[in-house]
Amino acid sequence: MVGFKATDVPPTATVKFLGAGTAACIADLITFPLDTAKVRLQIQGERQGPVRAAASAQYRGVLCTILTMVRTEGPRSLYSGLVAGLQRQMSFASVRIGLYDSVKQFYTKGSEHAGIGSRLLAGSTTGALAVAVAQPTDVVKVRFQAQARAGSGRRYQSTVDAYKTIAREEGFRGLWKGTSPNVARNAIVNCAELVTYDLIKDALLKANLMTDDLPCHFTSAFGAGFCTTVIASPVDVVKTRYMNSALGQYSSAGHCALTMLQKEGPRAFYKGFMPSFLRLGSWNVVMFVTYEQLKRALMAACTSREAPF
């Protein structure tokens, strides 16, 4: 057995809720530069046609993007928006991941056997609910990641300033800008991520290929990250463009997607795919492995407190 040993008592809803938020914050701290690189690649060329965008592209890959940002803006630019990102994960991951098992049990009416339908429903439900709670933090995070460009003024001076400025200039609706594509994205992401992780892990355990420990969690998380990136990238690009857009640039998320298709072609929907995969793959591995270990550690601590001798 690698890592903490599973306890006889299943983790409580509170343990899952706190464990998911904490694990997601740890994963964000490690993978945030990849997420920032992804955002820069996704918004690149949105005001130009495909030919001009390709010719004038400032960023040409994950490593190039990161190195260019460090050279022109300093290393701290890779973590621009981190505070909002951590706020987002504590409110967002706690709901969409921490409540997944509870909602899944609700749809199966307490049955131990969960079919693909109940898993998909649970993933969609917690993904959409998490967006309703955490959307303002996501808007601020994306704005910060996109703003720090050489030669242009900073739109926001701090996280608090960003919340205040967006609310003042765009109204409170500005803080929930992009909610529709984000609901769609996170329903898709949650289904792909959590359901794929669930299915891969169950298959590995049932086939006796692995035991329920770190290697199993690592393999399941990596597979879930790849599947999620392939499925969710188009919606993710539209979400990023729309949330970062100036007031009146796009009338809706659908208009944003149509404009991208007309000006940049279908490949625009997979802009930033490699950093998305590197980020989601590594994020999933760190998050799920940490989450599984945190659940066991917290339950072991609770058990030892209740029975110290």
Swiss-Prot record:
Molecular function via GO: antiporter activity; L-aspartate transmembrane transporter activity; malate transmembrane transporter activity; oxaloacetate transmembrane transporter activity; oxidative phosphorylation uncoupler activity; phosphate ion uniporter activity; protein homodimerization activity; proton transmembrane transporter activity
Mitochondrial intermembrane side: 1-16, 104-119, 200-217, 295-309
SUPFAM superfamilies assigned to the protein according to its UniProt record, in alphabetical order: Mitochondrial carrier (SSF103506)
Keyword Transport: yes
Catalytic activity of the protein: L-aspartate(out) + phosphate(in) + H(+)(in) = L-aspartate(in) + phosphate(out) + H(+)(out); oxaloacetate(out) + phosphate(in) + H(+)(in) = oxaloacetate(in) + phosphate(out) + H(+)(out); (S)-malate(out) + phosphate(in) + H(+)(in) = (S)-malate(in) + phosphate(out) + H(+)(out); malonate(out) + phosphate(in) + H(+)(in) = malonate(in) + phosphate(out) + H(+)(out)
Chief localization: mitochondrion
Solcar repeats by residue range: 11-106, 114-203, 212-297
Cellular location(s): Mitochondrion inner membrane
Protein family (similarity comment): Belongs to the mitochondrial carrier (TC 2.A.29) family.
PANTHER family membership: MITOCHONDRIAL DICARBOXYLATE CARRIER-RELATED
Cited function: Antiporter that exports dicarboxylate intermediates of the Krebs cycle in exchange for phosphate plus a proton across the inner membrane of mitochondria, a process driven by mitochondrial motive force with an overall impact on glycolysis, glutaminolysis and glutathione-dependent redox balance. Continuous export of oxaloacetate and related four-carbon dicarboxylates from mitochondrial matrix into the cytosol negatively regulates the oxidation of acetyl-CoA substrates via the Krebs cycle lowering the ATP/ADP ratio and reactive oxygen species (ROS) production.
Comment field on protein domains: The GDP-binding domain is located within the hydrophilic cavity, with GDP phosphates likely forming salt bridges with the charged residues, Lys-141 and Arg-185. The long-chain fatty acid-binding domain consists of an hydrophobic groove between peripheral transmembrane helices 1 and 6 near the matrix side.
Record-given protein name: Dicarboxylate carrier UCP2
